[in-house]
């Protein structure tokens, strides 16, 4: 299932209900259906009003035309024997001749002249008195009734602007259209105008009214019933002809209803696409922000987009040049090849201009194509554009779980990971509460930083509150013991490598913070002296004195105790947490948090409305905000979202899971009492601080800030769809509606806000805990910054980017606004200026206001509008030609190909529809022709029998008048019937020919033929319309009034062609033009035989229907193209997110999260772990600048990433200068995991030889490999990544730390797997920090020329009670044939220097590598009691281990001379040993 798709949870219907699903297009979820109805209403509201005006105009013009120039219906024949009023035929004086042919010809001419001269007389005088009793007053009554109807329509048009119309607009519109359509048919006595009039009314109701399928079907269906009963019972028109006419209208109604349903389904598909795109965008941002900080993501997007825009432009130019070359080769013209040279790189000022440019091919501006590779694909940025920034100062916190190894021994692996997941989830939520950034968690160490990547001056206070909150949470778990350390100083942050993108911090501050945690006491917070200096005015400390810090010497440290300002309340509440019943909060990975997007401030006009009287807040009295000046600056959300200032408590949130009710009440109100009993304090001057939270502190700055931080959901919640976003969309939205409506009324802005708050949802209260003071020049993401006194614009430098003090709108997590890149938008004191520009830039379309008056999808407004505006950046659409002009003709071809494949069945169905109408018109015309000729309406008495005998006896005698008339009319009728039969046969023969054509077209398989289907359909429609007109215009049919049926059929042809055929808009215009030409020629041909008035009426109906279809077809074509682009953006965003997640998490883990698995933990019995470390990293970092250091690491790790990907090894993480990989998990099918890792390690050692530092010093590294069981999984909800736990990880780290430079150190388990294919050297000093493990150095892979001798190698076991060494012989093959004496370093001081050097390397791992080492080597610190004495004991223990190793080396050196039976070393190995000794000394 795709990330953004909403699953269908409807139950399958049975019985007759399943057949009703065709008419029920509603979404299965009530909330989603409400969103759609609201969105549909505000999208089609203008079209509804336009349809009312159009219907009013049509009715008015038709009424005036009928009143001024009424149709002449005195000679109109009616097509049924019961209703035909016969006329006596007055035979003119005609000269009788002996020739029957002459007589027949003269008689026919006399009949024609009689018809033309209207020489009919009433037979019985009841035509006027009986059938049309109201003929005298018909025109007057019709005029009065229709003018009243026009007045009612105008009143209804005004009614559409009221609030009551919005609630039942479908019902009102349905009733109105039905009544108006019925009134249009009343007093209509000319049956020739009824078909065209009915079809036009159907088109207005079904297509142009803007109503959905069911209301349109009800209104038009009611009109059909009215038509049938009115003309059948009131006008008394009945018989076969009336039934056939009704059949034509019924088929036309069915076809129009199919088109109406199709259009609604198309609109619903677009809405679902936009909803999925919106949800996918939100979830993608949340997922990405869980992997990387928001600021880093935005900079990475911006930078990658610039690089890819150039690449895309070059690729498009190349494609166009290749296309031109191919065309020239086909035409035989020789053209010179086009050589595309890349444009010069943009300057420092160029990027901002390029971002604001709209991509058009005319000005050759850069195009950002959503079909191009992901804008967030890793490795798309160059070394010169690394995401690296320096931050000074920041506060770093390390929290270490001390008894983690003890928990692992006492509890099962699943229980330990569950516990760890609960702890880290609680910590992750606390980072949102206190506004700090989680860097990462490594094993049992949790790292937090304040002040970067988002700058804030109170970073130390935030981190201090975070540390106290972490202790309060840990007390609830009972069995977990932690120690916390803090330090303040400068750091460097950036992203390195091509795989497993992660944001790391580098610098001595990180190392010192790790030391503060490792030297702290259990349950205490140890801070350095710089931190104590920053927090001294706000917190109480306990002076610990000077302690010996590993790698730092003596440092003065302090224990953080509690706060000063909130002494009683804070300490009493949080100290009572451990007395409550231990409670582990439930994990709900399917929980989705959409507060940031759903609870919004509003758009630009919302803020502009309050600019005159100052900023407002829905839950703060105006008296408190009266002192706040109105000059503020606004930051726009990169995604166009709205800022969140309200939060509704929901089940499973941070406040419900982490904090008990007492603390929750305190966080909301600042008091232990109920929220109703604790009023907000009044602000008297600018020096006072608005705060009632645990983070309250008096700052010297003369600023006041209202901050709101919201928590982010879990990654699983972002992947698995949840209905919380739909359920929360109904809240907090009336404020936005009223603010939008009162945009221009600045004087009443505050009153409107207060009224809205009193009338709207009561659950949307802003927790007071989210209010904290920070300075004016800082805007934490997700906060509302209200400057109090200073109006001077202040900026904070972030690398090369500056940002102004602003109001953050709708940022995701703590995402900054585009003001970082494009600058903020300022509003003057009078509310004008840039505020108007903001409203112009992002207009309020009021999308999604609910049926019951609530803005149920206000979130969609800015999101969908922003998406609509972004289309011009991705695709350039020519709105006149309705074609894409981006990238030459490539985009247009791609759209056309996909459109044809998607709408193939629809195109064939449209062809069947017009063929069915063509055949139906032939059937109807046949029965009309039988009874519509002049011979059928003239009453002829039967010829007497005497005439028959006299005719047979004497043909030469002259005939009587009646006999001559009978023979003449009988001959005419026989000739006409023969012609009618021939024409009908030709029609149905053509119908069968068309069916054969459709069958042949449907069998087209190759796309090279299918791509011409639109042209084929266009010709098919034109030919069918021409045949229909021609067959009804040949003599004698040109003298018969068949235009009423033909007109309705042609209008249906045009409607199907425009709205259902699936051909291009301009092709439909060509078809329509030919239809109009054919009809007009036919009318001109028939005009000599019929009245001109009826043709004027037909032209009126025809032109009106054509205009309606042109407008609707144009917008449908535009609609389809925009919807296609939305789908491409959705696919692009999904690909980007999945690509990024795949780079950070394994594919199997992503699938598990998609399936709804809440906790991802697995046990693997046999995997191979790889860990490398750079030798002398501390000295190397001291010689290089921070940026040079990060660039060097990026070069190294990018190379390693490519090698790891080549061998299919999974990169776990980079920890400072350590590179951590694993093979064999999570893919259990990798049985050759040890060989993969071994080959990768060998190639890494070869590749790193070509990398040097800036001072041309080669880089050397140590590698450790071990094979064993591990526990792997994902814990936490922020900055998550795939992790490993277990003893095998610790052994691997020890293998690396005890290895030698440029050597691959493997354990015995790995050696047993690889010994048959690789050459090894046994390491005799086999003690690995309290572990008796045989270890080996992997040299290279075996070749065919290498001998495989079986030799006895030495394995050493050392006992702690006896410092001597014992030698044991085991048969192990193959190994390097070297004497032990050559493998032992002779100088004991060299061993000591090597160990010291390794310790320095550990100290130099500047991204918590020391913390990682402390995580893995917990055996040395399990018994710490968190005091200085225990730390000294650790040093003594470490010293004893060194003495044991030295004593063993002495014994080995003494026994060296006794080893006379050792094999001789060859020259190559001797050189290697010599080089190794020299390299060790140099290192």
Curated annotation (Swiss-Prot):
Give its localization: Membrane
Q: Sorted alphabetically, which SUPFAM superfamilies does this protein's record hold?
A: Nucleotide cyclase
Instruction: Output the InterPro entries linked to this UniProt entry.
Output: A/G_cyclase (IPR001054), Cyclic_nucleotide_synthase (IPR050401), Nucleotide_cyclase (IPR029787)
Question: Which key words tag this protein in UniProt?
Answer: cGMP biosynthesis, Chemotaxis, GTP-binding, Lyase, Magnesium, Membrane, Metal-binding, Nucleotide-binding, Repeat, Transmembrane, Transmembrane helix
Question: Which residue ranges run through the membrane?
Answer: 50-70, 143-163, 168-188, 198-218, 219-239, 242-262, 907-927, 982-1002, 1016-1036, 1040-1060, 1061-1081, 1094-1114
**Region listing for Disordered, in residue ranges:** 323-376, 598-619, 672-838, 1348-1369, 1393-1483
**GO cellular component annotations, sorted alphabetically?**
cell leading edge; membrane; plasma membrane
The Guanylate cyclase domain, residue ranges:
395-517, 1168-1296
**Record's Pfam families?**
Guanylate_cyc (PF00211)
Q: Which domain of life is it from?
A: Eukaryota
- The main location is membrane
Output one GO BP term: lateral pseudopodium retraction
Q: Give start-end positions of Low complexity composition bias.
A: 672-684, 693-712, 720-765, 1405-1416, 1446-1465
Q: How is its activity regulated?
A: Activated by guanosine 5'-3-O-(thio)triphosphate (GTPgammaS). Inhibited by calcium.
How and how many cofactors are bound, per the record note?
Binds 2 magnesium ions per subunit.
- Name the cofactor(s) required for activity, per the record: Mg(2+)
Q: What is its EC number?
A: 4.6.1.2
Q: What does this protein do?
A: Synthesizes cyclic GMP (cGMP) from GTP, after activation by heterotrimeric or monomeric G proteins. Involved in chemotaxis.
Q: What is this protein called?
A: Guanylyl cyclase, membrane
| Organism of provenance | Dictyostelium discoideum (Social amoeba)
Read off the lineage from the record.
Eukaryota, Amoebozoa, Evosea, Eumycetozoa, Dictyostelia
Give the encoding gene's name.
Answer: gca
């Amino acid at each position: 299932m795709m990330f953004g798709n909403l699953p269908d949870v409807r139950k399958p219907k049975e019985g007759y209900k399943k057949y009703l699903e065709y008419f029920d297009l509603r979404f299965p979820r009530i909330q989603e259906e409400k969103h759609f109805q609201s969105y549909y209403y505000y999208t089609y509201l203008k079209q509804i009003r336009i349809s009312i005006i159009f219907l009013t105009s049509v009715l008015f013009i038709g009424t005036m035309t009928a009143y001024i120039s009424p149709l002449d219906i005195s000679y109109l024949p009616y097509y049924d024997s019961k209703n035909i009023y016969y006329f006596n035929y007055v035979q003119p004086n005609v000269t009788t001749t002996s020739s029957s042919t002459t007589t027949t010809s003269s008689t026919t001419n006399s009949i024609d002249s009689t018809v033309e001269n209207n020489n009919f007389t009433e037979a019985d005088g009841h035509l006027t008195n009986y059938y049309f009793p109201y003929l005298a007053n018909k025109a007057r009554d019709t005029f009065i009734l229709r003018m009243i109807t026009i007045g009612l329509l105008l009143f209804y048009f005004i009614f559409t602007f009221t609030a009551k119309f919005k609630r039942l607009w479908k019902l009102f519109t349905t009733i109105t259209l039905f009544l108006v359509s019925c009134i249009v048919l009343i007093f209509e006595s000319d049956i020739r105008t009824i078909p065209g009039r009915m079809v036009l009314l159907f088109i207005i109701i079904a297509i142009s009214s803007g109503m959905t399928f069911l209301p349109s079907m009800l209104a038009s269906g009611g009109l059909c019933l009215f038509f049938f009963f009115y003309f059948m019972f009131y006008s008394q028109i009945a018989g076969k002809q009336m039934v056939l006419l009704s059949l034509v209208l019924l088929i036309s109604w069915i076809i129009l209803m199919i088109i109406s349903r199709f259009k609604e389904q198309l609109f619903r598909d677009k809405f679902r696409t936009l909803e999925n795109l919106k949800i996918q965008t939100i979830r993608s941002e949340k997922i990405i922000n869980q992997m990387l900080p928001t600021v880093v993501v935005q900079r990475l997007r911006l930078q990658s987009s610039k690089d890819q825009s150039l690449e895309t432009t070059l690729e498009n130019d190349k494609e166009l040049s290749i296309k031109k070359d191919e065309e020239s080769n086909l035409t035989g013209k020789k053209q010179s090849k086009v050589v595309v040279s890349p444009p010069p790189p943009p300057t420092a000022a160029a990027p901002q201009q390029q971002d604001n440019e709209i991509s058009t091919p005319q000005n050759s501006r850069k195009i950002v194509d959503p079909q191009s590779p992901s804008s967030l694909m890793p490795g798309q940025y160059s070394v010169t554009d690394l995401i690296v920034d320096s931050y000074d100062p920041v506060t770093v916190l390390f929290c270490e779980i001390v008894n983690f190894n003890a928990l692992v021994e006492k509890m099962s692996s699943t229980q330990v990971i569950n516990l760890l997941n609960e702890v880290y989830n609680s910590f992750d939520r606390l980072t949102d509460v206190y506004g700090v950034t989680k860097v990462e968690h490594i094993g049992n160490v949790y790292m937090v930083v304040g002040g970067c990547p988002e700058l804030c001056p109170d970073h130390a206070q935030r981190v201090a509150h975070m540390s106290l909150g972490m202790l309060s949470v840990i007390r609830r778990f009972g069995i977990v013991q932690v120690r916390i350390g803090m330090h303040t100083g400068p750091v460097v942050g950036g992203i390195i490598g091509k795989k497993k993108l992660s944001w790391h911090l580098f610098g001595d501050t990180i190392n010192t913070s790790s030391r503060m945690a490792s030297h702290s006491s259990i349950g205490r917070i140890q801070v350095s002296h710089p931190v104590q200096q920053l927090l001294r005015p706000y917190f109480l400390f306990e002076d610990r004195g000077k302690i010996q810090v590993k790698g730092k010497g003596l440092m003065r440290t302090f224990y953080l105790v509690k706060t000063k300002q909130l002494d009683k309340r804070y300490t009493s509440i949080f100290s009572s947490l451990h007395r409550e019943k231990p409670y582990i909060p439930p994990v709900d990975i399917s929980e989705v948090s959409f507060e940031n997007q759903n609870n919004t401030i509003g758009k630009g006009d919302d803020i502009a409305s309050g600019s005159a009287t100052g900023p407002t807040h829905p839950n703060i009295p105006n008296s408190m905000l009266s002192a706040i000046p109105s000059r503020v600056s606004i930051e726009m959300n990169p995604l166009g979202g709205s800022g969140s200032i309200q939060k509704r408590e929901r089940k499973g949130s941070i406040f419900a899971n982490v904090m008990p009710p007492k603390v929750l009440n305190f966080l909301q109100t600042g008091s232990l009492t109920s929220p109703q009993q604790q009023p907000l304090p009044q602000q008297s001057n600018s020096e006072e601080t608005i705060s009632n939270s645990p983070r309250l502190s008096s700052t010297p700055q003369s600023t006041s800030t209202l901050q709101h931080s919201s928590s982010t959901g879990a990654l699983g919640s972002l992947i698995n769809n949840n209905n919380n976003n739909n359920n929360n969309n109904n809240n907090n939205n009336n404020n936005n509606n009223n603010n939008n409506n009162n945009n221009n009324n600045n004087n009443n802005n505050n009153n409107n806000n207060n009224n809205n708050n009193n009338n709207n949802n009561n659950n949307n209260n802003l927790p007071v805990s989210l209010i904290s003071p920070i300075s004016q020049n800082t805007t934490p993401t997700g906060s509302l910054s209200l400057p109090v006194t200073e109006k001077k614009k202040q900026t904070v430098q972030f690398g090369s980017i500056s940002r102004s003090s602003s109001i953050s709108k709708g940022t995701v997590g703590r995402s900054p606004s585009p003001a970082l890149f494009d600058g903020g938008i300022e509003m003057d004191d009078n509310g004008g200026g840039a505020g108007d520009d903001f409203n112009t830039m992002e207009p309020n379309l009021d999308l999604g206001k609910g049926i019951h008056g609530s803005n149920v999808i206000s979130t969609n407004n800015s999101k969908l509008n922003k998406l609509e505006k972004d289309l011009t950046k991705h695709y350039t659409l020519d709105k006149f030609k309705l074609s894409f002009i981006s990238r030459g003709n490539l985009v247009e071809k791609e759209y056309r190909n996909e459109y044809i494949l998607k709408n193939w069945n629809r195109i064939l169905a449209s062809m069947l529809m017009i063929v069915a109408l063509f055949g139906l018109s032939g059937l109807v015309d046949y029965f009309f022709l039988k009874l519509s000729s002049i011979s059928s309406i003239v009453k002829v008495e039967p010829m007497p029998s005497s005439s028959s005998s006299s005719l047979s006896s004497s043909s030469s005698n002259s005939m009587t008048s009646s006999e001559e008339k009978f023979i003449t009319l009988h001959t005419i009728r026989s000739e006409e019937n023969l012609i009618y039969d021939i024409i009908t046969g030709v029609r149905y023969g053509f119908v069968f020919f068309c069916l054969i054509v459709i069958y042949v077209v449907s069998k087209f398989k190759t796309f090279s033929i299918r791509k011409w289907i639109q042209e084929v359909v266009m010709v098919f429609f034109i030919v069918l319309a021409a045949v229909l007109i021609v067959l009804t215009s040949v003599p004698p049919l040109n003298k018969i009034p068949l235009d009423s049926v033909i007109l309705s059929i042609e209008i249906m042809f045009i409607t199907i062609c425009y709205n259902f055929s699936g051909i291009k808009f301009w092709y439909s215009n060509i078809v329509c033009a030919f239809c109009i030409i054919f009809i007009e020629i036919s009318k001109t041909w028939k005009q000599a035989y019929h009245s001109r008035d009826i043709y004027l009426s037909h032209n009126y109906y025809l032109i009106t229907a054509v205009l309606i279809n042109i407008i609707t077809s144009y917008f449908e074509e535009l609609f389809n193209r925009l919807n296609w682009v939305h789908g491409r953006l959705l696919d692009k965003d999904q690909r980007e997110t999945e690509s990024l997640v795949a780079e950070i998490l394994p594919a199997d883990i992503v699938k598990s999260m998609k399936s709804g698995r809440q906790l991802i933990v697995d046990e693997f019995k046999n995997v191979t772990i790889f860990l490398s470390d750079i030798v002398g990293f501390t000295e190397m970092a001291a010689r290089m600048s921070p940026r040079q250091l990060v660039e060097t690491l990026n070069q190294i790790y990018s190379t390693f990433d490519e090698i790891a990907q080549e061998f299919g090894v999974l990169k776990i993480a980079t920890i400072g200068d350590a590179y951590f990989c694993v093979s064999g998990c999570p893919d259990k099918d990798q049985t050759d995991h040890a060989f993969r890792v071994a080959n990768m390690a060998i190639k890494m050692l070869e590749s790193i030889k070509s990398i040097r530092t800036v001072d041309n010093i080669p880089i050397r590294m140590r590698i450790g490999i071990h094979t064993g069981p591990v526990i792997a999984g994902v814990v936490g909800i922020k900055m998550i990544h795939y992790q490993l736990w277990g003893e095998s990880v610790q052994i691997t780290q020890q293998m690396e730390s005890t290895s030698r430079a440029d050597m691959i150190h493997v354990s015995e388990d790995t050696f047993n797997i690889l010994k048959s294919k690789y050459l090894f050297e046994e390491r005799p000093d086999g003690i690995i920090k309290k572990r008796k493990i045989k270890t080996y150095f992997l040299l290279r892979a075996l070749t065919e020329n290498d001998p495989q001798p079986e030799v006895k190698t030495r394995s050493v076991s050392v006992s702690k009670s006896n410092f001597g060494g014992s030698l044991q012989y085991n048969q192990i093959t193959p190994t390097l044939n070297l004497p032990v004496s050559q493998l032992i370093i002779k100088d004991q001081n060299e061993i000591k220097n090597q160990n010291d050097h390794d310790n320095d390397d550990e100290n130099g791992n500047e991204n918590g590598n020391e913390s990682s080492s402390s995580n893995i080597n917990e055996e040395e610190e399990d018994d710490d009691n968190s005091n200085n004495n225990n730390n000294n004991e650790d040093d003594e223990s470490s010293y004893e281990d060194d003495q044991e190793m030295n004593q063993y080396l002495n014994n080995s050196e003494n026994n060296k001379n006794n080893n006379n039976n050792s094999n001789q070393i060859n020259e190559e190995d001797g050189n290697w040993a010599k080089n190794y000794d020299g390299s060790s000394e140099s290192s």
